[in-house]
């Protein structure tokens, strides 16, 4: 095995010009020039599908422990100080995306059970009808708000949070929680997330979702805060991913007359194939992280044990060695092993919900918006997630 060249011809830089609007040209350059990059002694970025897929499916590789990570990263604000983030530091121990072993399996099973029982087709239909009613008379609006409102209504039905917990508050809470998980997070972001979690706590009481989770994990005797923490994960995992995937898919479909007509004419099976292609193309979760338990070789590079492997799912999804014409949306793409929701035992919790939502409501939403013009999108300055902040929509005059 050879050692990593510490001077790659193209070095990953999320602050390169245009990255937050469209990261794919830069990711392509990284993948083609240096598909495995070492950023520090024990940290590597992986851009090629082969390497990303190999790592993400290895059941022996672990995710980062969120509690330990936060304490190590910001010891003062997570040390229990009154001016710090004691609540955030305490409850993240039940966030399944940062758990390993049996506890990960238990939390994941409980959440999946609750989502399966409560995220019904009837709840989706009701959310769609309420959304169309709320936006029908608007001549101009934000597409991300339209898609977010649909998810807000659906999640309120599923999670059972109070009716007076407003859409803007849910959107802000979800955004703060995902900001906290990003690269290069300032202390102010953690403090804002702590405050938002505390303020939102009264809106999440006992619900059918909480009852199912408690019942499935009865031997752990979850506290109210721990149950609330699990509900928060279900909230932001579903809200951020589903809203972004939905909005970005509509952004691609509506200006394309052929694609619009394809969606409206497609049967259920063809729509499912298209949904997978849209998920591959958009890839809202751009990165995930693993730690290898033993030394490994990736792309001919020696990687020491317990290295931080930062897997670029977005780059892997555009790898031409796996996907024909990867930078295009091919509605009937048959070979599509995309990694948008990860893979293996840490498959994204919000993935199943996003798939069902897209398959169920994509066509009626396209029909609702087919006479609208879509303006240039503005994207959030996040690295872990590639999500739109604002997509202007204006109805054409009759």
Model-inferred region functions:
Residues 1-147, 152-167, 175-183:
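Active-site substrate-recognition loop segments, prototypically the cytochrome P450 B′-helix/B-C loop
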Residues 27, 355-398:
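Cytochrome P450 proximal C-terminal region
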Residues 159, 169-225:
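Cytochrome P450 catalytic core segment centered on helix I
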Residues 205, 218, 265-301:
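Conserved cytochrome P450 K-helix E-x-x-R motif and the immediately C-terminal K′/meander segment
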Residues 230-235, 239-263, 351-369:
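Cytochrome P450 catalytic-core helices
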Residues 314-336, 375:
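Conserved cytochrome P450 K-helix/beta-meander segment immediately N-terminal to the heme-binding cysteine loop
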């Amino acid at each position: 095995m050879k050692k990593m060249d510490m001077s790659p011809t193209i070095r990953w830089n999320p602050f390169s010009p245009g990255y937050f609007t469209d990261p794919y040209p830069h990711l392509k350059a990284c993948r083609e020039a240096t598909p495995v990059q070492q950023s520090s002694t024990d940290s590597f970025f992986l851009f090629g599908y082969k390497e990303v897929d190999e790592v993400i499916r290895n059941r022996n590789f672990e995710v980062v422990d969120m509690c330990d990570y936060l304490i190590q990263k910001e010891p003062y604000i997570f040390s229990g100080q009154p001016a710090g983030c004691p609540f955030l530091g305490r409850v993240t121990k039940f966030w399944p995306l940062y758990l390993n072993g049996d506890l990960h399996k238990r939390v994941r099973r409980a959440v999946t059970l609750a989502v399966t029982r409560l995220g019904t087709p009837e709840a989706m239909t009701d959310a769609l009808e309420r959304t169309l009613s709320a936006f029908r008379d608007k001549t101009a609006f934000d597409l991300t708000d339209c898609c977010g409102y649909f998810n807000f209504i659906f999640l309120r039905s599923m999670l059972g949070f109070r009716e007076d917990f407003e859409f803007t508050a849910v959107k802000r809470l979800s955004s703060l929680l995902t900001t906290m998980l990003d690269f290069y997070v300032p202390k102010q972001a953690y403090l804002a997330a702590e405050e938002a979690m505390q303020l939102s706590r009264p809106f999440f009481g006992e619900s059918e979702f909480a009852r199912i989770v408690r019942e499935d994990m009865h031997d752990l005797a979850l506290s109210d805060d721990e149950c609330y923490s699990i509900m928060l994960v279900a909230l932001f995992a579903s809200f951020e991913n589903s809203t972004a995937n939905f909005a970005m898919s509509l952004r691609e479909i509506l200006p394309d007359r052929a694609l619009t007509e394809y969606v409206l004419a497609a049967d259920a099976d063809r729509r499912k194939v298209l949904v997978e292609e849209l998920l591959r193309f958009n890839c809202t979760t751009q990165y995930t992280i693993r730690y290898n338990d033993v030394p490994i070789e990736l792309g001919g590079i020696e990687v020491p044990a317990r290295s931080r492997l930062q897997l670029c799912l977005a780059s892997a999804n555009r790898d031409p060695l796996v996907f024909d014409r990867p930078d295009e949306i091919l509605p009937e793409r048959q070979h599509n092993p995309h990694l948008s929701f990860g893979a293996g035992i840490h498959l994204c919790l919000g993935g199943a919900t996003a798939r069902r939502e897209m398959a169920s409501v994509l066509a009626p939403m396209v029909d609702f918006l087919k006479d609208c013009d879509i303006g240039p999108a503005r994207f959030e300055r996040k690295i872990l997630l590639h999500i739109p902040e604002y997509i202007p929509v204006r109805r054409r005059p009759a």
